[in-house]
């Protein structure tokens, strides 16, 4: 095979509309494909408490999905405020992922200082929201992995390329994050 052999997806958009039925659909639709499709479970459905969506997924709604062999962990924890301030629902989602020995991806643009320390100490493993080298280095020095993003809207490879020549190269990876297929 040539090209992409594996993708890791976060079905939060379909979950916002269809709830767990949407996640089930994604699993069924990707079964047996000639590409390995893995999943991170959506951490924020709806994305914010003010959003009106087709579903509200608490930690109980996603917990049973951790038993699926293609589930890698909890997708981009966008509610950094909830992590830092110990929101019970956010903490429950993190604890559930950890209980299943799964990774927790981050989403914390420009988080700094003690807030960043608390976010990472909660178990958030990686981040794909670094737009400059200083933000990436702050997270790397605290133990996070950095996903260097080249998506349709956000492109950070040029700004973060120096990381690929330094001592943190083994803690860096690439991601697309919302890439249009055209």
Name what the model sees in each region.
Residues 2-103:
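Divalent-metal coordination cores built from histidine and acidic residues
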Residues 10-11, 174-181:
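Short beta-alpha connecting loops at secondary-structure transitions
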Residues 43-45, 152-153, 178-180:
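Glycine-rich beta-alpha junction loops
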Residues 56-76, 82-148, 152-174:
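Histidine/acidic residue-rich metal-binding segments in metalloenzymes
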Residues 98-100, 179-182:
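Short secondary-structure boundary segments
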């Amino acid at each position: 095979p040539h090209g992409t052999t594996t993708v890791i997806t976060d079905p939060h958009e379909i979950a916002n509309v269809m709830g767990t039925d949407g996640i089930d659909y994604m699993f069924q639709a990707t079964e047996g494909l000639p590409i390995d499709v893995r999943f991170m479970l959506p951490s924020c459905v709806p994305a914010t408490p003010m959003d009106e969506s087709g579903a509200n997924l608490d930690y109980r709604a996603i917990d049973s999905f951790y038993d699926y062999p293609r589930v890698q962990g909890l997708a981009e924890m966008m509610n950094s405020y909830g992590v830092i301030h110990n929101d019970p629902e956010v903490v429950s989602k993190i604890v559930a992922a950890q209980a299943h020995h799964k990774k927790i991806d981050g989403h914390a643009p420009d988080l700094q200082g003690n807030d960043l320390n608390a976010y990472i100490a909660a178990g958030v493993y990686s981040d794909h929201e670094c737009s400059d080298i200083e933000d990436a280095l702050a997270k790397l020095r605290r133990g996070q992995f950095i996903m260097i993003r080249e998506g349709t809207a956000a492109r950070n490879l040029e700004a973060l390329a120096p990381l690929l020549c330094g001592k943190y190269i083994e803690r860096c990876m690439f991601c697309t994050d919302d890439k249009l297929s055209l």
